[in-house]
C-alpha cells in the first residue's frame, strides 16, 4: 500500500484473501525478483534508460528494488502526490509523466 505503515502490512500477512481490503497488492516475491533482474539484464547493454513507472504497483519497496537492480536511472510517476511520496522516501530522480495543473499544485 502506498501509505500503509509496516505494522499494518505485517498484520495482513496470512489473512484469507476475501478478508483483505482492496485494492491490495499480492505479490510472489521470487517471481517479482526474477522479473526485476531480467529487466535489469535486458537494459544493461542498451542505449536506452530504464525508468520504471510507480503507478503500476505504488509500492516504495518495489520501486527501491527496481532501482537497486542497477539499470534504472530513476522512477516515473503519474501524479504530484505520488512524486511527493517518493521524495519523502528518499527518491531523488523522479519524472512526473503528466502535466501539473493549478497554482496550488505548482507551489507544492
Residue ranges and their predicted role:
Residues 18-22, 43-45, 64, 89-92:
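A generic short-segment signal for beta-strand/edge and adjacent turn/coil regions
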Residues 53-108:
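Active-site-proximal beta-alpha core segment in soluble small-molecule metabolic enzymes
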Residues 21-29, 49-53, 69-75:
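Active-site mouth loops of central-metabolism enzymes
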Residues 4-14, 79-83:
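Short, acidic/polar
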Residues 7-12, 31-62:
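N-terminal glycine-rich anion-binding loops that anchor highly charged ligand groups
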Amino acid at each position: 500500500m502506498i501509505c500503509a505503515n509496516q505494522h499494518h502490512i505485517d498484520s495482513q500477512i496470512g489473512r484469507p484473501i476475501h478478508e483483505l481490503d482492496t485494492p491490495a497488492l499480492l505479490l510472489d516475491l521470487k517471481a517479482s525478483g526474477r522479473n526485476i533482474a531480467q529487466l535489469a539484464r535486458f537494459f544493461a547493454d542498451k542505449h536506452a534508460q530504464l525508468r520504471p513507472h510507480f503507478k503500476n504497483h505504488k509500492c516504495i519497496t518495489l520501486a527501491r528494488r527496481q532501482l537497486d537492480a542497477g539499470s534504472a536511472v530513476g522512477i516515473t510517476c503519474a501524479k504530484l502526490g505520488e512524486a511527493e511520496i517518493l521524495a519523502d522516501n528518499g527518491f531523488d530522480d523522479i519524472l512526473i509523466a503528466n502535466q501539473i495543473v493549478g497554482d496550488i499544485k505548482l507551489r507544492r
